C-alpha cells in the first residue's frame, strides 16, 4: 500500500499511462541532448515523414546525418537569436530552398478527410522521466519529474507532488520558483510549465 502512495510511483503511473496511448512513446533522459535541446532520433523520424527530406539530402548534403546536424544547428541558432520554439513549430524554416517542418498542427475540419494534412498524424509525442535540463550553473544536474517532447523538441515540463507524502501543488510551484533559474535555456525554450498533485494541475513558471 505504501508503494502506491510513493511520489515516484505517481510519476511512473502518469508516464506509463501516456506511453500506453497511441499518441505517445516513452523515452529516456539519455536520449535527449541538453545542449542541443533535442531528442535527435525522434526529430529524424518526423523529418523522414516529409517528402522533401530525401530530396534535400540527395541534392544538398553528404548524407542524412549531415542534413540532420544542420537542421539541429539551425534550430538552436534561431532559438539563441530570440525566435520562440512555438514559432518554429508553427512555421518551420527554409533550408536550401525547402521548407523544414518541425510539427504539423491540426488542420481545419473538412467534409473530405483526404484534405487533411497527412503529416499531422505523424507527430510524435514523447514522455521522459527524471530528465536533467542543465549541465552548469544554478540548475546543474537538476531533474524534471516529467518532460513532454513533440518530435524530439521540449514543449512541456511538469513537477509532481503526491498529497499522500504531505506535499501538494503549492510545493511544486514553490520548487519551480526557488529551484529553477528563470534564464535557464531549456526552461525558457519550453512552451509551458505545470505543477501537479493528485487533484490539481496549475500553470507555473520558474520565476516568483
Q: What feature does the model see in each segment?
A:
Residues 1-205:
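An alpha-helical interface "stripe"
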Amino acid at each position: 500500500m505504501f508503494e502506491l502512495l510513493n511520489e515516484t510511483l505517481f510519476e511512473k503511473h502518469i508516464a506509463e499511462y501516456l506511453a500506453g496511448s497511441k499518441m505517445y512513446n516513452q523515452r529516456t533522459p539519455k536520449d535527449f541532448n541538453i545542449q542541443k535541446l533535442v531528442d535527435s532520433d525522434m526529430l529524424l523520424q518526423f523529418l523522414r515523414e516529409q517528402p522533401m527530406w530525401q530530396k534535400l539530402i540527395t541534392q544538398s548534403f553528404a548524407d542524412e546525418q549531415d542534413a540532420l546536424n544542420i537542421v539541429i544547428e539551425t534550430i538552436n541558432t534561431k532559438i539563441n537569436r530570440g525566435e520562440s520554439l512555438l514559432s518554429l513549430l508553427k512555421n518551420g524554416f527554409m533550408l536550401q530552398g525547402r521548407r523544414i517542418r518541425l510539427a504539423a498542427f491540426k488542420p481545419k475540419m473538412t467534409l473530405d478527410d483526404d484534405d487533411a494534412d497527412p503529416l499531422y498524424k505523424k507527430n510524435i509525442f514523447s514522455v521522459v522521466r527524471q530528465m536533467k535540463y542543465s549541465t552548469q550553473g544554478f540548475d546543474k544536474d537538476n531533474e524534471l519529474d516529467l518532460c513532454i517532447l513533440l518530435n524530439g523538441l521540449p514543449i512541456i515540463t511538469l513537477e509532481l507532488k503526491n498529497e499522500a507524502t504531505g506535499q501538494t501543488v503549492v510545493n511544486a510551484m514553490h520548487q519551480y520558483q526557488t529551484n529553477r533559474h528563470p534564464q535557464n535555456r531549456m526552461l525558457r525554450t519550453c512552451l509551458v510549465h505545470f505543477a501537479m498533485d493528485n487533484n490539481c494541475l496549475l500553470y507555473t513558471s520558474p520565476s516568483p
